[in-house]
């Protein structure tokens, strides 16, 4: 399970966000979302003391679409100056990267440690049109980039080098949640002290499990079985 610390409810009137996910027979998905209260996060909602004790601060790229949310992100990053918290950013969507490039560049200026994105998001971030060129651009960055590429596996670009982790051949029925599962598994393995290439292999395995089921979550016993691979 998950230990929840410092979570509070400050607004009982604004509705929660909702997301309708449509999955086609080829396992692709599209979403129709209303963000609700999730686009109104403010710094008064954040317990900076708890944040500064965290091992990882994970930022969703979608946070750039709301001025309130973006301000909360930058205030949080400001508060982490001098603390040992690792900072990770998910690019979330290639259209978001294209549309809010200046805000992404602002976040990246805070010495982000890890950037997660898929093939299309990596091309958007680097302004390239193929994955090889994107990797070459990312080799010059001072953050570690992890690029997912569906059944082809993933790339870890760090310190001027690119590490390829092969994917697992499975029959996908729903890709909803695969990127989040990958990032969560990668960071979990990292916090367990695993090497980067081991984190990539474990994250590929976790993502291969979630695409074989409908919905973005596994059952409790499936998570337990998965953790035995670490």
Language-model features and meaning:
Residues 1-3, 53, 111, 141, ...:
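Short loop/turn motifs at secondary-structure junctions
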Residues 1-59, 226-230:
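Conserved N-terminal subdomain of the carbohydrate kinase-like
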Residues 11-15, 96, 124, 170-172:
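A short acidic, often aromatic-flanked loop/helix-cap motif at beta-alpha or helix-coil junctions
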Residues 4-6, 112-113, 163-166:
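Short hydrophobic/aromatic-enriched beta-strand-loop microsegments
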Residues 9, 35-38, 93, 120, ...:
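Short, acidic/turn-prone active-site loops that include or flank metal/cofactor-
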Residues 48-51, 109, 139, 193:
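Alpha-helix termination/capping residues and helix-transition junctions
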Residues 78-79, 101-102, 127-230:
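Conserved phosphate-binding/catalytic region of the ribokinase-like
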Residues 56-136, 143, 152-154:
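Conserved beta-alpha-beta core of the PfkB/ribokinase-like small-molecule kinase fold
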């Amino acid at each position: 399970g998950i230990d929840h610390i410092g979570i509070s409810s400050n607004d009982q009137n604004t509705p929660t966000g909702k997301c309708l996910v449509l999955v086609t027979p080829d396992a692709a998905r599209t979403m129709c979302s209303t963000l609700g209260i999730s686009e109104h996060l403010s710094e008064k909602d954040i317990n900076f003391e708890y944040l500064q004790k965290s091992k990882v601060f994970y930022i969703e790229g979608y946070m750039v679409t709301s001025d309130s949310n973006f301000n909360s992100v930058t205030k949080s990053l400001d508060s982490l100056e001098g603390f040992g918290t690792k900072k990770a950013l998910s690019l979330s969507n290639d259209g978001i990267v294209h549309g809010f490039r200046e805000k992404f560049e602002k976040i990246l200026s805070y010495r982000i440690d890890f950037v997660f994105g898929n093939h299309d998001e990596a091309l958007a971030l680097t302004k390239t049109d193929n994955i090889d060129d994107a990797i070459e651009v990312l080799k010059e960055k001072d953050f570690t980039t992890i690029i997912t590429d569906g059944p082809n596996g993933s790339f870890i670009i760090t310190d001027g080098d690119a590490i390829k982790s092969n994917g697992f051949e499975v029959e996908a029925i729903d890709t909803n949640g695969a990127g989040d599962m990958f990032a969560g598994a990668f960071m979990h393995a990292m916090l367990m002290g695993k090497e980067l290439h081991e984190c990539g292999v474990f994250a590929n395995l976790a993502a291969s499990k979630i695409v074989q089921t409908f919905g973005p979550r596994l059952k409790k016993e499936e998570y337990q079985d998965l953790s035995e691979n670490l």
